[in-house]
A protein has these predicted regions:
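Short helix-coil-helix linker/hinge
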Residues: 11-19
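DNA-recognition helix of helix-turn-helix
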Residues: 33, 39-63
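Short, conserved catalytic or interaction motifs in soluble domains
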Residues: 16, 27, 52
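Intrinsically disordered, low-complexity basic tails/linkers immediately adjacent to helix-turn-helix/homeobox/MYB/SANT
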Residues: 67-69
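Flexible coil/turn residues that form the inter-helical turn or adjacent wing/linker of helix-turn-helix
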Residues: 28-29, 34
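Acidic, proline/glycine-rich intrinsically disordered inter-domain spacer in sigma factors
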Residues: 1-12
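A short pre-motif secondary-structure segment
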Residues: 21-25
Length: 69
């Protein structure tokens, strides 16, 4: 599962293809080539989806941080 409700909501707002790649890569721990094979797309497609997803999440979560207390 995702570490925080704020992050979870941001991930759920991603486009379907990006959200799927993020969940499979970061939550399920799959490798890019495994995701590509499972989804029947080139590995570069998965890399691109993850890159776009990270950019969107970075912009949406700007200023958000983990409370270290």
């Amino acid at each position: 599962s995702l570490p925080d409700p704020t992050v979870s909501r941001a991930v759920m707002r991603l486009p379907d293809e990006q959200r799927t790649a993020v969940i499979l890569y970061y939550v399920q721990g799959m490798k890019i080539r495994e995701i590509a094979k499972a989804l029947k797309v080139p590995t570069q497609t998965i890399s691109s989806r993850l890159s776009r997803a990270r950019s969107k999440l970075r912009a949406e979560l700007e200023g958000w941080y983990f409370d270290e207390e």
